[in-house]
Swiss-Prot record:
This is Nucleolar protein 58. It comes from the Eukaryota. Its main location: nucleus. Residues 293-417 form the Nop domain. GO terms for molecular function: snoRNA binding; snRNA binding. One of its GO terms (cellular component) is nucleolus. The keyword S-adenosyl-L-methionine does not apply. GO terms for biological process: box C/D sno(s)RNA 3'-end processing; endonucleolytic cleavage in 5'-ETS of tricistronic rRNA transcript (SSU-rRNA, 5.8S rRNA, LSU-rRNA); endonucleolytic cleavage in ITS1 to separate SSU-rRNA from 5.8S rRNA and LSU-rRNA from tricistronic rRNA transcript (SSU-rRNA, 5.8S rRNA, LSU-rRNA); endonucleolytic cleavage to generate mature 5'-end of SSU-rRNA from (SSU-rRNA, 5.8S rRNA, LSU-rRNA); protein localization to nucleolus; snoRNA guided rRNA 2'-O-methylation. Residues 461-582 are annotated as: Disordered. Residues 507-519 have a biased composition (Low complexity). It is found in: Nucleus, Nucleolus.
């Protein structure tokens, strides 16, 4: 006997195949199951195991989809096949290969799986209502009830596959944080309007009361400022601020307003109070939602920052797909793309900057702290997004976030201590206190160094060398001056002429010094230097002697003429005589 196992929304069904020869002709099998009458002739309901509730149905159907045999299925097959009559002769057909191997292994019966028999299951599924309703006895079932149960089971099975939980709907968090930001803007606008409006009547009150809600409540309770002394503000303000407010109301410089103005101000104050109260309720709702959806992320960065991260990414699953580097700069996209465009430094943090761990860090450590918080936040987000809903509802669910926060706090204290020690060390270094640390070698200025300017000696250098005192002259012989590039290009005779001209200029520019001093200086000079000085003096004297001799001759001839009484010879006569002689 061949039997077919088929799972339905009602339960597990066993069908007897009346003609097993038709199963061998698989090509024509679909023709026998096209009509309800043909399906009823080929298959007969043998037994059915009804599900007691939806949870049992979801568990059993999920086990079959995974190729496993549930306890209820094992009991059903044991009662109907193993303990029944004709155990060795019966053959069971199933739709899953893994399920077939598990049943054959655990129950020891003959189980068949053939992919060519899929038309058989397709025909059973199409004519299931007819096959179940045609049965007699307790197994009869209304087709309408079957459709209802199939729909309910499909929804439950889909929810189980997706691990759906109403508390895990992050859309509520996205909408709540968006509404919270809008309410903050609206409260700020209305509160500023109230202060500007009522400030004409009581301008000093704006500096005394800074809280927007307390400001609106005081206006609602007091009305005109003249009623301040008779109004009790103990439920709204502290005692010190209340006394200051009453004292300022008596000497206020504000103008008077009418009853109509005050009524409109009161209505605006009512709006501020109601919106602020609703904002408080919404914040509590957001806290509860974040604790249910992302407990680890909330424990690490806080509910507001976590909700803004989820809202910016779109959903918790999308946020879990981001790496830690993206989580770190999430919310700073404009600054990031501007930095990439201008080739400047990229931002170090985005929305995560507003977390308490980054906020309490010093300015120098904010970037490093943001990177570490983003790393731990990425792990917490993935755990919150992919963990089961039952796991997160436990008391110890956010342990990963709490442990990560404790580690980051200890790490922050260690970094602050290191930065403090380095600051003290730099201060000691600036003050000159090096401690026991040995100083590194540094080249200090002030020692004797090589004078490159002494390599090329010009006219002024020679003159200064000649005028130097003997004690200031170097004890070592001077090196011969090197020729310049222009002198190298000249010929040997031209270079000699240039040297002579320079020496003559030096000798002409020398002041007359006493002979004793020059002789004493010459004694201290080296042999080569004395020769050079003598030669320069001779050249200078040789240039000046012809002119002096001519002047001396003219003076002597004039004196002789005066003594002898002969007339003075004209300058042109000598030239004429010379020309005649020539």
């Amino acid at each position: 006997m061949v039997k077919v196992l088929f799972e339905t929304a009602v339960g597990f069904c066993l069908f007897n195949v009346s003609d097993s020869s038709k199963l061998e002709a698989t090509k024509n099998l679909h023709e026998s199951l096209d009509s309800a009458e043909g399906a009823s002739n080929l298959l007969k309901l043998s037994a059915i195991h009804r599900f007691t509730n939806t949870a049992e149905a979801v568990e059993d159907i999920s086990a079959i989809n995974e190729g496993k045999m549930s306890k209820s299925l094992k009991k059903f097959l044991t009662d109907e096949i193993v303990e029944g009559k004709g155990k060795e002769k019966e053959n069971l057909i199933v739709a899953e290969s893994k399920l077939a191997s598990n049943i054959a292994k655990k129950l020891g019966i003959q189980v068949t799986y053939d992919s060519e028999l899929l038309d058989l299951y397709r025909g059973i599924r199409e004519n299931l209502a007819t096959l179940l309703s045609s049965s007699s006895g307790d197994e009869s079932l209304d087709p309408r009830d079957l459709n209802t149960m199939s729909l309910g089971l499909s929804h439950s099975l889909s929810r189980y596959k997706l691990k759906f939980s109403p508390d895990k709907v992050d859309t509520m968090v996205v909408q709540a944080i968006g509404l919270l930001d809008d309410l903050d803007k609206e409260i700020n606008i209305y509160a500023m309007r109230v202060k500007e409006w009522y400030g004409w009547h009581f301008p000093e009150m704006g500096k005394i009361i800074t809280d927007n809600l307390a400001y609106a409540k005081v206006i609602r309770a007091m009305g005109f400022r003249t009623n301040a002394s008779a109004t009790d503000f103990s439920e709204i303000l502290p005692e010190e601020i209340e006394e200051t407010l009453k004292a300022a109301a008596e000497i206020s410089m504000g103008t008077e307003i009418s009853e109509t103005d005050l009524e409109h101000i009161w209505s605006l104050c009512d709006q501020v109070i109601s919106i602020t109260q609703y904002r408080t309720q919404l914040y509590q709702y957001l806290q509860n939602r974040m604790a249910a959806i992302a407990p680890n992320l909330t424990a690490l960065v806080g509910d507001l920052v976590g909700a803004r991260l989820i809202s910016h990414a779109g959903s918790l699953m999308n946020l879990a797909k981001h790496p830690a580097s993206t989580v770190q700069i999430l919310g700073a996209e404009k600054a990031l793309f501007r930095a990439l465009k201008t080739k400047h430094d990229t931002p170090k943090y985005g929305l995560i900057y507003h977390s308490s761990l980054v906020g309490q860090a010093p300015q120098k450590l904010k970037g490093k702290m943001a990177r570490m918080v983003a790393t731990k936040a990425a792990l917490s987000i993935r755990l919150d997004a992919l963990a089961d809903a039952d796991t997160k509802s436990d008391e110890g669910a956010p342990t990963v976030g709490i442990e990560a926060r404790a580690k980051l706090e200890s790490r922050l204290r260690a970094l602050e201590m290191q930065s403090g020690l380095s600051g003290m060390r730099s201060a000691r270094n600036a003050a000159g206190d090096q401690g026991h640390k040995q100083k590194g070698f540094q080249m200090e200025a002030g020692g004797r160094s090589y004078n490159a300017a002494a390599d090329a000696a010009g006219p002024s250098d020679m003159a200064s060398a000649a005028n130097m005192a003997p004690s200031m002259l170097p004890s070592t012989p001077a090196k011969p001056s090197t020729t310049t590039d222009e002198e190298k290009k000249l010929s040997k005779e031209e270079r000699k002429a240039l040297k002579k001209a320079r020496k003559s200029e030096i000798a002409a520019s020398e002041p007359a010094t006493p002979a004793a001093a020059s002789e004493a200086g010459d004694d201290k000079l080296s042999k080569e230097e004395r020769k050079a000085l003598k030669k320069a003096k001779k050249d200078a004297n040789g240039v000046e002697t012809p002119k002096k001799e001519k002047k001396d001759k003219k003076k002597r001839s004039a004196d002789e003429a005066d003594v002898n009484g002969t007339p003075k010879s004209e300058p042109g006569s000598s030239k004429k005589k010379k020309s005649k002689k020539d």
